[in-house]
């Protein structure tokens, strides 16, 4: 069996460092591992429209931004097929067929759907398209016969629902769809990176994101204003690590070699944490170290982004070609689904019997 990856993002704004540690870094690693026969990354514009239906221009203007983010982090269009969801109409038809295999109550029990509905204040009036997006995601995944789906922890219930749909379809209609497996970040700190203000999740509306496209000075300003331990008022005071956003980011991004380069007084992160906890280490020093760590990560991304920004027609062609390849693959899955459901009426004369 071919090993295939499908993953993607909603184009509702620039991607941030939470996206990077949550899934983008893993995608680049998997892409370069040589273990996968095909890799598809989807810019999920149709899904973004489920809560932006009255403002499609917001989605449109972010297509190229997200594509540039992908290329900046190291996604290679020679190894990975980047495509736009709405340019693959087969996904919509697959979604329609899968809807018959899922109950309303099952979607309502999905923890991710519950959280998203609450976050968007949809409790009183939920758009049908938004409510059904777990089913749409199942269509996205199965259309490309994905065996692996690298996502953040918050998307785990969505993949579980997809697996239920695959099982149900194969039980009712015969073995047709590929059962996908979830690929989660190995570092617990990467599962869900908090915002710079210590809030549970990065959000554009809360203004607590460090974007992959942020200039160097903007990143520095955001890090220096980060939430730490509110009781760590004086340098000599013992500091707490729990809920301290700066140390959460260090857990996610810091590598052993960063100490030799930026903070040679310490051998590793454990030593730094121990000093902070017993007192005598100020927040400013730790934040400056984190800034150096983050800049070393983001600087190569800025360089790659600048190169691609000067070649936007090429980026356009990458998306166009990628969408054409994706549509061809999805059509093959749709043909098999129709055949399994016995609704491929005009492929033979069986309808006349």
What are the residue ranges of the model-derived segments?
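N-terminal Rossmann-like or analogous alpha/beta NTP/dinucleotide-binding catalytic cores
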Residues: 2-139, 257, 296, 305-306
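Internal, conserved structured core segments that host functional sites
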Residues: 113-115, 119-169, 173, 194-195
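Conserved nucleotide- and phosphate/pyrophosphate-binding catalytic cores
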Residues: 157, 163-353
């Amino acid at each position: 069996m071919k090993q295939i990856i499908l993953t993607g993002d909603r184009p509702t704004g620039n991607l941030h460092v939470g996206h990077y540690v949550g899934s983008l870094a893993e995608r680049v690693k998997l892409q370069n591992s040589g273990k996968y026969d095909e890799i598809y990354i989807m810019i999920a514009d149709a899904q973004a429209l489920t809560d932006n239906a009255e403002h499609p221009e917001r989605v449109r203007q972010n297509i190229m931004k997200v594509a540039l983010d992908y290329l900046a982090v190291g996604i290679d269009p020679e190894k990975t097929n980047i495509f736009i969801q709405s340019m693959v109409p087969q996904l919509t038809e697959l979604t329609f067929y899968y809807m018959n295999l899922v109950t309303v109550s099952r979607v309502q029990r999905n923890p991710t759907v519950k959280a998203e509905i609450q976050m968007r204040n949809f409790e009183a009036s939920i758009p049908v398209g938004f409510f059904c997006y777990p089913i749409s995601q199942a269509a996205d995944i199965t259309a490309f016969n994905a065996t692996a789906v690298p996502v953040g922890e918050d998307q785990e219930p969505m993949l579980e629902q997809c697996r239920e749909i695959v099982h149900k379809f194969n039980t009712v209609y015969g073995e047709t769809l590929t059962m996908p497996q979830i690929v989660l970040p190995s570092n617990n700190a990467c599962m869900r990176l908090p915002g710079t203000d210590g809030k549970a999740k990065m959000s554009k509306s809360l203004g607590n994101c460090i974007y992959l496209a942020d200039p160097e000075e903007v990143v520095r300003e955001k890090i220096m204003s980060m939430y730490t331990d509110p009781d760590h008022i004086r340098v000599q005071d013992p500091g707490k690590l729990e809920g301290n956003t700066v140390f959460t980011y260090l857990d996610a991004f810091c590598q052993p070699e960063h100490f030799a380069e930026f903070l040679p007084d310490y051998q590793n992160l454990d030593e730094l944490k121990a000093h902070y906890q017993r007192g005598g280490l100020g927040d400013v020093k730790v934040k400056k170290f984190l800034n150096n760590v983050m800049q070393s990560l983001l600087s190569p991304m800025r360089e790659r982004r600048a190169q691609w920004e000067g070649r936007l027609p090429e980026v356009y062609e990458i998306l166009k070609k990628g969408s054409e390849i994706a549509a061809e693959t999805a059509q093959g899955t749709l043909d098999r689904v129709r055949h399994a459901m016995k609704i491929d009426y005009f492929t033979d004369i069986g309808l006349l019997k």
